Curated annotation (Swiss-Prot):
GO terms for biological process: glycine biosynthetic process from serine; tetrahydrofolate interconversion. CDD domains: SHMT. This is Serine hydroxymethyltransferase. It is found in: Cytoplasm. Catalyzes the reversible interconversion of serine and glycine with tetrahydrofolate (THF) serving as the one-carbon carrier. This reaction serves as the major source of one-carbon groups required for the biosynthesis of purines, thymidylate, methionine, and other important biomolecules. Also exhibits THF-independent aldolase activity toward beta-hydroxyamino acids, producing glycine and aldehydes, via a retro-aldol mechanism. (6S)-5,6,7,8-tetrahydrofolate binds at L121, G125, H126, L127, S355, P356, F357. Pathway: One-carbon metabolism; tetrahydrofolate interconversion; Amino-acid biosynthesis; glycine biosynthesis; glycine from L-serine: step 1/1. Homodimer. It comes from the Bacteria. Signal peptide: none annotated. It is an enzyme of class 2 (transferase). SUPFAM superfamilies: PLP-dependent transferases.
């Protein structure tokens, strides 16, 4: 018999200490990694539920195990909410991650060796969009497209590459691009050569759900996303589509299970269902609008302080600061800001002279600080502190002074009150 009062603290002090230290770190550090966010206690309640015990290979109503009548309800709720939120007529909530959702699309629609057009990682793409170290770059013939001198997607070059290489699939989406993608233009290019348009909206799904960023679902053959990041749910993946054939949807389902995964994580799917319901609330739209406002406010300060921002601004939740002219590396900036309790990630910038392990830039995102309650005034103040650190990157007194300010504002704006 398992006693409900069993706990980690009494049983595994070493593990519990690390967990508690991470809790403190999250409360005492300002989180600016664009792919990170704080999920609600309701989502964590779902993830810590007894649903974790249940195997449920298959799909609602078509399981390979018995005893699935209640997890069927859970998964169907998540499916229905995903379809409603994004205006889709197909949803698969089983992918364990965004990368596995992307793997599903590749295996459902392509054969190894097929040609794919994907955004260059150095220009803002993602590992799964064709990086040579990833399955996508190893199994498929990847042709990269990128951004122009203004920092925006070069659609003319994309169209030229498409007509020249005749890819079977074009990938839209990004991990470090601060502009608005013209999904209709991408579909037009895909249709002109008979290619699939696959959109990975992992970074902007929350903005899309709130109507703050254009929805790719009506334009793409298939859309994937993570359920964390701007969507603020549990770590996981999601596949969506609209107007496709039953044959396409069967291919996608089969590529998830049994093609790429076994049993779904029902406790995580419950967390997805909660997050999707939360994303339908009016306050979620207000939150996403503030995410975008805060990003613009921070960019304004960086530009005023003489820092170069890729594309000159942002139209979503993130932006890239190019440090080449400052003779700083992303690695140095990341470390110095970290000592001030400000967490960012080093990031390559277009035409970066440094390696991906060093880089010449940092990526800044506002979902997490906005979740704490920051508005434009706090975002601008924070950007100023970051510039202070970067201007005096070797001055530990400056870094310590900013750390004190960070601790103070974190205490005033706790993650979990």
């Amino acid at each position: 018999m398992l006693k409900r009062e069993m706990n980690i603290a009494d049983y595994d002090a070493e593990l519990w200490q690390a967990m508690e230290q991470e809790k403190v770190r999250q409360e005492e550090h300002i989180e600016l990694i664009a792919s990170e966010n704080y999920t609600s206690p309701r989502v964590m309640q779902a993830q810590g539920s007894q649903l974790t015990n249940k195997y449920a290979e298959g799909y609602p109503g078509k399981r390979y195990y018995g005893g699935c009548e209640y997890v069927d309800i859970v998964e169907q709720l998540a499916i229905d909410r995903a379809k409603e939120l994004f205006g889709a007529d197909y949803a698969n909530v089983q992918p364990h991650s965004g990368s596995q959702a992307n793997f599903t699309v590749y295996t459902a629609l392509l054969e190894p060796g097929d040609t794919v057009l994907g955004m260059n990682l150095a220009h803002g793409g993602h590992l799964t969009h064709g990086s040579p170290v990833n399955f996508s770059g190893k199994l498929y013939n990847i042709v990269p497209y990128g951004i122009d001198a203004t920092g925006h997607i070069d659609y003319a070059d994309l169209e030229k590459q498409a007509k020249e290489h005749k890819p079977k699939m074009i990938i839209g989406g990004f991990s470090a691009y601060s502009g608005v993608v013209d999904w209709a233009k991408m579909r037009e290019i895909a249709d002109s050569i008979g290619a699939y348009l696959f959109v990975d909206m992992a970074h902007v799904a929350g903005l899309v759900a709130a109507g703050v960023y254009p929805n790719p679902v009506p334009h793409a053959h298939v859309v994937t996303t993570t359920t964390h990041k701007t969507l603020a749910g549990p770590r996981g993946g999601l596949i969506l589509a609209k107007g496709g054939s039953e044959e396409l949807y069967k291919k996608l389902n089969s590529a998830v299970f049994p093609g790429g995964q076994g049993g779904p994580l029902m406790h995580v799917i419950a967390g997805k269902a909660v997050a999707l319901k939360e994303a339908m609330e009016p306050e979620f739209k207000t939150y996403q609008q503030q995410v975008a406002k805060n990003a613009k406010a921070m960019v304004e300060v960086f530009l005023e302080r003489g820092y170069k921002v890729v594309s000159g601004g942002t139209d979503n939740h993130l932006f890239l600061v190019d440090l080449v002219d400052k003779n700083l590396t992303g690695k140095e900036a990341d470390a110095a800001l970290g000592r001030a309790n400000i967490t960012v990630n080093k990031n390559s910038v277009p035409n970066d002279p440094k390696s991906p392990f060093v880089t010449s830039g940092i990526r800044v995102g506002t979902p997490a600080i906005t979740r704490r309650g920051f508005k434009e005034a706090e975002a601008k103040e924070l950007a100023g502190w970051m510039c202070d650190v970067l201007d005096s990157i070797n001055d530990e007194a400056v870094i310590e002074r900013i750390k004190g300010k960070v601790l103070d504002i974190c205490a005033r704006y706790p993650v979990y009150a």
